Amino acid sequence: MLYAVLCYNDESVTSAWSKEEDERVMRDLSAVQRKYVEAGKLGPVARLVPTTAAATLRHSAGETIVMDGPFAETKEQLLGFYLIDCASLDEALDFARDLSNANPSTGSYEVRPLALYKPGELPS
């Protein structure tokens, strides 16, 4: 089954890292990724740019509004995601644990099963 592993963190913490700290964290996370790539389980991985570059489109009262940044007023923001093919939720949680152990910050990892739909096909 495919799972999305969504990476959340306080953007003010991660943006304060020095270049060296950021490179070290990325290197440690890459080591975790390699293990799952070699097992044929890891799909696309993305690191999102800061929320200051984001826009949110919201439909309200018959109007479409575009706002700068994310809509959620929260300390933790979605900073990246992984797609992983695992036999069980427990296996996907093990992957998230490995990521968490490689990342010294206080962020969180949300693991969510995926339902895939092919373009032009409706789910049954």
From Swiss-Prot:
Signal peptide: none
Source species of the chain: Rhizobium meliloti (strain 1021) (Ensifer meliloti)
Domain of life: Bacteria
Family as reported in the entry's similarity comment: Belongs to the YciI family.
InterPro entries in alphabetical order: Dimeric_a/b-barrel (IPR011008), YCII (IPR005545)
Pfam families per the UniProt record, alphabetical: YCII (PF03795)
The protein, known as: Uncharacterized protein R00369
